[in-house]
Swiss-Prot record:
Compartments where located: Periplasm
Signal sequence range: 1-22
Protein name: Chaperone protein Skp
NCBIfam families: PRK10780.1
Gene Ontology biological-process entries: chaperone-mediated protein folding; protein stabilization
Organism annotation: Photorhabdus luminescens (Xenorhabdus luminescens)
Length: 165
């Protein structure tokens, strides 16, 4: 009986010591901070701005044209012939619908491209995390936003940022 009790307590002690060893190989990284500090993020933002500049200016031109027609209708609608006013109202409605469709397509395309570029950058960050974790011997790397408390010595954000740059 004493041998069984001794073996059980030895097994429990082993289990607790294995957990303590695993905790030594956990690191924390702040992916959001790395993302914000990357110069590539600003370059991508400028690239997307240039990519969508023509469509944005076309939408602004369409909006200005639509606003001028609406103002003309409001200003001169009461003095216009009935057929002219009807034609202008139809034109305004058609332009408003066309503008809405183009604006929605623009927003969707812009959002899609932003997500593509963001995912490329996040993939680079993820690869850098794997490299740094492998070099420093960490088994688990957790995002700092998911951790309530961590020891500052186990934060590998700076190392990952250097690796990504």
């Amino acid at each position: 009986m004493k041998k069984l009790l001794c073996a059980a307590s030895f097994g429990i002690a082993l289990a607790f010591s294995a957990g303590a060893q695993a905790a030594d190989k956990i690191a924390v990284v702040n992916v959001g901070e790395i993302f914000q500090q990357l110069p590539a993020r600003e370059a991508v933002a400028k690239q997307l701005e240039n990519e969508f500049k023509n469509r944005a200016s076309e939408l602004q031109r369409m909006e200005t044209d639509l606003q001028s027609k609406i103002q003309k209708l409001q200003r001169d609608g009461s003095t216009m012939k009935s057929s002219e006013r009807t034609n202008l109202e139809k034109e305004v409605m058609a332009k408003r619908e066309e503008f809405g469709k183009k604006a929605q397509a623009f927003e969707q395309d812009h959002r899609r491209r932003e997500m593509e570029e963001r995912n490329k950058i996040l993939s680079r960050i993820q690869d850098a995390i794997k490299v740094v974790a492998g070099k420093e011997g960490y088994d688990i790397v957790i995002d700092a936003n998911a951790v309530a408390y961590s020891v500052s010595g186990k934060n590998i954000t700076a190392s990952v940022l250097k690796q990504v740059k």
